[in-house]
């Protein structure tokens, strides 16, 4: 089968050498297209919630996510792992995907996950390393919707005036992963 394709590139006395470069260009374009398509399929496959959970070292993350308002809410919108834990596409998405995926794979293979202090990682100062504010803002661009309470409006105004020192996680740490010990219903 391969040899029949190789015949395409043999120089024929009738065809001359001028047509040969076009064959390489066409073949190169086809190979590039197939390579890019395969990469995109791989990116989509490894971006599913099921794939994240297949090697995520935090065993309780799936259950906590399914109890959160990012999974179970009145609007029916489900926010997926990559929506929060990776920056929006075009803003370092692939690099962050490689970095975090490598760390999770390493943790799964070489760390004792029972010794990891997951509660400490729920601190906003630490959680900021695993949650991207650009991702929050991609979905929540309007910080002052008409349904926001007065307290929520005051909190968002305070956030807006202190962007250098406050993140979404300071108030909304349990939005993505429910924690019954840290619930502020008016903040979700």
Language-model segment annotations:
Residues 5-188:
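Short sequence/structural segments immediately N-terminal
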